Structure formats: structure tokens, C-alpha cells
Amino acid sequence: MNLKNYNERVVVTGMGVISCIGQTVNKFWNNLVEGNSGISKLTQVNTDGYSCKIGGEITNFDPNDYMDKKEAKRMARFSQFAVAASLEAISSADLDFNKIDLDQIGVFLGTGSGGLPETEKEDLLMFQKNKNTISPLYVPKMLPNMA
């Protein structure tokens, strides 16, 4: 594809976000504009042995607000964030999916690295408890593109 001659237009119709400074676009934006960093003492991970004890954690997130319990259980937390943000984006897009060509819709989603808690859990089971099997959901839960 020659990008010089690529004349397709892209229109952003919906956005969603789950972050340490907001779990909706409006809350995220307001906190960003007000200069709130979302950085605080880490509470969700054990920081013993590490000099850094601060970070940006997502708190008060309930996946059951966005999906049923069975779905949530099959997903790593970062994938749950992606679903929640996607649902907000779909809602804010206000598109009638019955009247548009679905092949013309795309999604841009960013994640750094997902599923690290699942990797840690399975490593502990295998190497410290000498368990010879891993969860069948391990691979789907740890892959970044599962978000």
C-alpha cells in the first residue's frame, strides 16, 4: 500500500478509557486537566524488596458492571479494562449498527503488557509448588492481544 496516495478518511466516533485517573472519558479528561496524576502508594501489588512503592493503580473497578461473572472469570484484568473501555466507546459513538457497513469500523486499542498476575500465579504453582500443569486459561489471559 502506498500511503502517499491513500485518501481514506478516519473519523473517531467513540472513545473509552479505563485508567488510574478515570474510568470514563469525562472523568479521565477532567482529572488530566486538573493535573491529577493518579500516582499513589501501591496497594494491589507487594512492593517488598523494591525501592519504588508508588504507581498508577486502577481502583474501584468492578468487571461485573460491564460483563457477567462467567465472562469476567475467563479474562485477565487488563482484558476486562479493554472490554469496559470498548463498551464506553461504542456507547459514545452512538452509531446505528443496523444501518452501517460493519466492515468499515475499526478499533484502536493500546496496552503495554497484560496478564502479568496470571503469569506470576502460574510460575509460583509450577516452580514453588512443583505443579506439572497450568490453567487452560493461562495463555488467553496473558496475551496482550486478548484485550
What are these model-predicted stretches?
Residues 1-147:
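Conserved "HGTGT" condensation-loop signature of ketosynthase/thiolase-family condensing enzymes
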